[in-house]
């Protein structure tokens, strides 16, 4: 009697990844200037001394990029990072300039440490597709931070827009991280716990402590 052999199942192989909608994707670090000095953040990505680029300089950077790419006739997807973008007084005017111009911009995403005012984020939420807040326990004011997150989450309704929290997995703050994730889950707010690469850290330990008053 012959026996039938089961076919060997092969692991699926990714051949090609394509976007669901073609676009020109730009990650724009508008400057290294930051109002926080996190111990694990490399000097290339933050400092507290460099000058903020003004609105005209930022406009010129965009115009240069746009002139080189617009003939592709594709929408633009822009992700802003820093430094801390909201620390630059020209950032909100830049977003308004981009949205009010005839630039075929489909999406704008912003990463922030949450240190700007609630009113600022309420204005920003009307102009962008998504805001990602990041927790940094050396500087965080927990209750204020999560109050802002909750308010913005109510404004940015999925799937058209999104609010997200990057919980930084700081080794000294694990107990608070459990509190953060529990609170975010209860509020039905999108979050992820982000691992940290300490290779380029500027200090070997945290020297500051934020205000721990959540819960």
Please place each PLM-identified region on the residue numbering:
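Catalytic nucleophile-elbow at a beta strand-turn-alpha helix junction centered on a G-D-S/GDSL motif
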Residues: 32, 83-86
